[in-house]
């Protein structure tokens, strides 16, 4: 995978942050798999995948793929490309899968659930947790608490 090519992937992560994230994933994936909370279209997942792959490690991505508050219709970051007209809702999962397949990131394992639901059943040790999910205070606080409890 060519990291520079990830600039083309839809997402909000600047290249320099993605490059740093990839280095952290490489460093901490020698202790266990990586978990990403909040996936959107997979840009950060791909940076994590690149780093974790150097240690033959998995990246678990947790996202309901219905978008955060700011991705909803009439909001600042609404995007028609991820809007499903059949269900009248945001659905970033098809574009996420397309991006993961395009870059052949076979070490990425999607968990299509809310972080709250996933946290209730997760009990495996992780080398690193990257949290960039919902930005509402309630979501951030709960997700951080559960990530800390299970690490």
Model-based region annotation:
Residues 19-101:
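SAM cofactor-binding core of SAM-dependent methyltransferases
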Residues 134:
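Switch II (G3) loop of P-loop NTPases
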Residues 1-28:
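Class I SAM-dependent methyltransferase Rossmann-like catalytic core
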Residues 108-109:
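Short, conserved active-site loop motifs that form the nucleotide-linked donor/cofactor pocket
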Residues 137-142:
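A short, conserved alpha-helix within the catalytic core of class I
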Residues 121-129:
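A short acidic, Gly/Pro-enriched loop at the edge of an enzyme's catalytic core
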Residues 113-117:
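Conserved SAM/SAH-binding loop
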Residues 143-150:
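Conserved small/polar residues in nucleotide/adenosyl-binding loops
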């Amino acid at each position: 995978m060519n990291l520079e090519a990830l600039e083309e992937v839809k997402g909000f992560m600047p290249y320099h942050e993605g490059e740093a994230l990839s280095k952290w994933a490489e460093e901490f994936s020698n202790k266990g798999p990586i978990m990403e909370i909040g996936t959107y279209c997979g840009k950060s997942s791909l940076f994590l995948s690149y780093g974790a792959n150097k240690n033959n490690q998995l990246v678990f991505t947790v996202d309901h793929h219905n978008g955060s508050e700011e991705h909803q219709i009439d909001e600042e970051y609404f995007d028609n490309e991820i809007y499903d007209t059949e269900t009248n809702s945001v659905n970033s999962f098809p574009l996420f899968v397309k991006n993961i397949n395009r870059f052949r990131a076979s070490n990425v394992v999607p968990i299509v659930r809310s972080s709250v639901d996933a946290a209730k059943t997760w009990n495996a040790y992780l080398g690193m947790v990257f949290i960039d999910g919902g930005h509402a205070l309630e979501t951030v606080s709960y997700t951080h608490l559960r990530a800390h409890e299970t690490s």
